[in-house]
Amino acid sequence: MVVGSQAKSVETIVIGSGPGGYVAAIRAAELGQKVTIIERDAIGGVCLNIGCIPSKALINAGHAYYSQNHQMDSIMGVQSKGATLDWAATQKWKNEKVVNTLTGGVAMLLKKHKIDIVRGEARFNDNQVVNVISEDESHLLEFEKCIIATGSRPIEIPGFAFKGRVVNSTGALSLPDVPKHLVVIGG
């Protein structure tokens, strides 16, 4: 326990606000529970912010680019080889139109269901108390029910630190330019 701190009592906590966490939190709220989400980073978790969704957005943009340059040629004889890719505009679309729209929608749903959000990293003190640690403070939450819906983190392979030409999945989604070659390890 944090010395001198008294735990705030809550009914149900959900650790993580990604697709597993926010859906569980909303369902628990619909069933009448008072729910508190504990989130270390951005609402929507890894998947909506720096994982599945932005990856699929970039893949979709790549398919659109390829289609503009190749698909029509073989079907109707239409020549359309002049398409170009504005990578900065693609990144802006991914971040503003896809990620921000979806995470904003999740935040609105959480607010609609009166779900409290506590920012920080949860660490269990015992089977009914978590210590929520943020950059500038920590506080205790005593709970009746807990759902753990944490995301993932990339791990560094010894000898391949994330710097320079070696990037993790988050770095790959925000590269300043489209690489000519790319090796993916894991997945």
Name every feature range the model reports, one short phrase each.
Residues 21-22:
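N-terminal Rossmann-fold NAD(P) dinucleotide-binding loop
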Residues 94, 186-187:
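NAD(P)H cofactor-binding loop motif with strongest signal on the N-terminal glycine-rich segment
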Residues 2-9, 26-33, 38-178:
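Glycine-rich flavin
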Residues 4-18, 180-185:
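Beta1/beta-strand and adjacent pyrophosphate-binding region of the FAD-binding site
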